[in-house]
Amino acid sequence: MGKSNTIVLSNEKDIQLRIQQLEERKEKRKNVKLLFSPIKTTKYFLYILKDTLVSGIRYFQTRPFLLFFIALFASLTFIAVYVPGEHQKYMGKYSDLISDCIWWVGLGVLSSIGLGTGLHTFVLYLGPHIAKVTLAATEWNSVNFNVYGANSFIQPATAMIGGVSFWMILQKVQWAALFWGAGTAIGELPPYFVARTARLKGLKLEQEKKLKEQQEKPIDEKDQPKKGLLERLSEKVPALIGNLGFFGILAFASIPNPLFDLAGITCGHFLVPFWKFFGATFIGKAVVKAHIQACFVILAFNMETLTMVISFIEDKIPFLKNKIQPILEKERQKLNSTVSANSPKSLVGLAWDCVLFLMISYFLMSIVDSSVQEYLIEKDNKKIELLKSKLEKQQPKETKKTK
């Protein structure tokens, strides 16, 4: 009996030691990055791609109708774009608009995903686009020019009578702002669904565990330990979100703030209904927030406002006198002249391209790093859960043998 007890206790200690080692390794997983461990990170990222591909194949195997409709849509799109026919004249008319919609929605998604490490496409793309439209409209005193396609930003033959108003410029850029905002709302969906699924699984496991504990050892309410502050707060948060509801989420989504980066995870975790979450997020981000940012850029890059600001800066900082104004004049000359597409880029243009390249590279690396870290931590969590279940099975045996 004594020998048997010693073996059981030894196994229990080994399991606890292994759990501790895995917990420590989980912390070290955060240091696995493409920059420091390129071979290891690339290897695990390929495993993730393989698992994702297998999961996708299994998903569509159980949903043949969905696969059929996706294939049908892709086939019709291919025929409409590439097969010659009468429909091509209509496609030519709307193809630029469709491609631009896809472009801005895609940039919005890239800006929203990544939990704060996403590609800040408003600063890199939408903001400069709105600024360019504003500069062109106020310089030419007209909004009768294309902003997309081969014939974009060509000076109109005549100026508009009565001048260009703020609202005219806003109408010129509002579709780009709307589609970009829609993309940022769509980018909140993956973390919402992941958190919602994890929460539902967790609730099921938690309910089963509580039921098992109640069956094995019933406890009176008086004997139950007092709940900690964190437990009490976690119970009140869902009620708080429920009380805020649609308009609370709408208010958070409408104001540019870093607190909304975790909105998808938060709402998914507390099981906020999908349409309440997505509807409020879509209106807040696409209609309100994107237009607030667009209005700010239009006001800031109006030629008159810009000239006043530059004059003020040059008066206050003598070092910058006659250095900012020539840059503005150069941009005005670019707008008023037809520049060859093959003309060499300026130093500023090359520097901006380098900034874009570095930002996109960092964004892609952060996706790889976070995916690999999450994959490795999940593997460790599964091992820990398995060891804990073994430990729970051994503890009753140990109790019986001690008796």
Curated annotation (Swiss-Prot):
It comes from the Eukaryota. Disulfide bonds: none annotated. Its main location: membrane. GO terms for cellular component: endomembrane system; endoplasmic reticulum membrane; membrane. It is found in: Membrane; Endoplasmic reticulum. GO terms for biological process: aggregation involved in sorocarp development; asexual reproduction; autophagic cell death; autophagosome assembly; autophagy; contractile vacuole organization; endoplasmic reticulum organization; endoplasmic reticulum unfolded protein response. Keywords: Coiled coil, Endoplasmic reticulum, Lipid transport, Membrane, Transmembrane, Transmembrane helix, Transport. Residues 7-33 form a coiled coil. The chain crosses the membrane at residues 65-85, 102-122, 150-170, 175-195, 240-260, 263-283, 294-314, 348-368. It is a multi-pass membrane protein. It catalyses: a 1,2-diacyl-sn-glycero-3-phospho-L-serine(in) = a 1,2-diacyl-sn-glycero-3-phospho-L-serine(out); cholesterol(in) = cholesterol(out); a 1,2-diacyl-sn-glycero-3-phosphocholine(in) = a 1,2-diacyl-sn-glycero-3-phosphocholine(out); a 1,2-diacyl-sn-glycero-3-phosphoethanolamine(in) = a 1,2-diacyl-sn-glycero-3-phosphoethanolamine(out). Disruption phenotype: Mutant cells display defects in the protein secretory pathway and in organelle biogenesis, and are deficient in their ability to initiate development upon starvation. The contractile vacuole, which is necessary to survive under hyperosmotic conditions, is non-functional in mutant cells. Phospholipid scramblase involved in lipid homeostasis and membrane dynamics processes. Required for autophagosome formation: participates in early stages of autophagosome biogenesis at the endoplasmic reticulum (ER) membrane by reequilibrating the leaflets of the ER as lipids are extracted. In addition to autophagy, involved in other processes in which phospholipid scramblase activity is required. Belongs to the VMP1 family. This is Vacuole membrane protein 1 homolog. It comes from Dictyostelium discoideum (Social amoeba).
